[in-house]
A protein has these predicted regions:
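Helix-start/capping segments and mature chain N-termini
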Residues: 1-76, 80, 91-264
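Non-catalytic DNA-binding core/recognition domains of DNA-processing enzymes
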Residues: 84
């Protein structure tokens, strides 16, 4: 597919004209979703579609026909060259659907994590969008401690996830993650990893752990942008990170899941 040069910016969508440069700012985000787009290829695109359209429907974001039409037009408008980190949005008030085009930031292969668990400040933890600004503040505080990410914890200190990432770890040969009854975002990348583990016969367990109990374990923070990032350093407290003996092979597998956008 040949496209003209595409610049960063916000495109507001209407059924009549499709995505077009937005005239003003949107209201508070009700729903958002984002993914890595590299040379027109993405992983788990159907899962992002399902999560975003389902969340929009729950928020009264329009009929299924309207939401599907937006997704189709949005997909056609995505760049087919370069590295991008697009975000789709549903705004409160007008229920406007938007596409935010932005270049992908530098990708990381490892992550430093603030070892002091942060109380989970989210108001809608199972839906991406409403709490993005609040979580950006948490990450900002982590950066002040020399870290890339922070771990959100519940009142009892049990870990939930990172500010912008899902949390997984290994206990011997068992892949572990927080129990689904906890208020965590259903991560697309986490779902892909769990599917591979099941196909490979790897045991998966949902366990409650504090940050302290992650010391000496191989811990991963995963999301749609960076993929799998093993924790190589805990900052702010004398915690040791385990060697990331599994991460490289799983990162290679995850990169190979990148597929062309539908219709290309």
């Amino acid at each position: 597919m040949t496209q003209p040069a595409i610049a960063e910016g916000v495109l507001a969508w209407t059924p009549a004209r499709g995505p077009a440069p937005a005239a003003g700012s949107a209201g508070q985000l009700l729903v958002a979703d984002s993914w890595l787009l590299r040379e027109g290829r993405v992983r788990g695109f159907d899962r992002h579609r399902e999560r975003f359209l389902g969340a929009c429907a729950e928020c009264g974001g329009g009929s299924p026909r309207r939401l599907v039409a937006f997704w189709q037009d949005m997909t056609a408008a995505l760049p087919r060259t370069g590295a991008w980190f697009p975000r789709v949005e549903l705004a409160a008030g007008t229920l406007e659907l938007r596409l935010l085009l932005r270049h992908a930031p530098p990708l990381g292969s490892a992550v430093r994590v603030w070892a002091t668990g942060q109380p989970d400040p989210r108001t809608v933890p199972r839906r991406k969008g409403p709490d993005l600004d609040t979580l950006a503040g948490v990450r900002g505080r982590a950066a002040g401690e020399g870290a890339d990410e922070a771990v959100l914890v519940g009142p009892s200190g049990v870990v939930r996830e990172g500010a912008t990432s899902s949390l997984l770890w290994w206990e011997d040969d068992t892949l572990c993650l927080p129990p689904p009854r906890l208020p965590v975002l259903p991560g697309v990348t986490t779902g892909l990893i769990q599917d591979r583990a099941r196909r490979s016969g790897i045991r998966i367990a949902h366990r409650e752990r504090t940050v302290d109990e992650l010391e000496g374990r191989e811990v991963w923070l995963v999301n749609a942008l960076h993929g799998i990032r093993p924790v190589t350093e805990w900052t702010g407290r004398p915690m040791k990170a385990a060697p990331a003996v599994r991460a490289a092979e799983w990162r290679t597998w995850l990169d190979e899941l990148m597929e062309p956008l539908p219709g290309d």
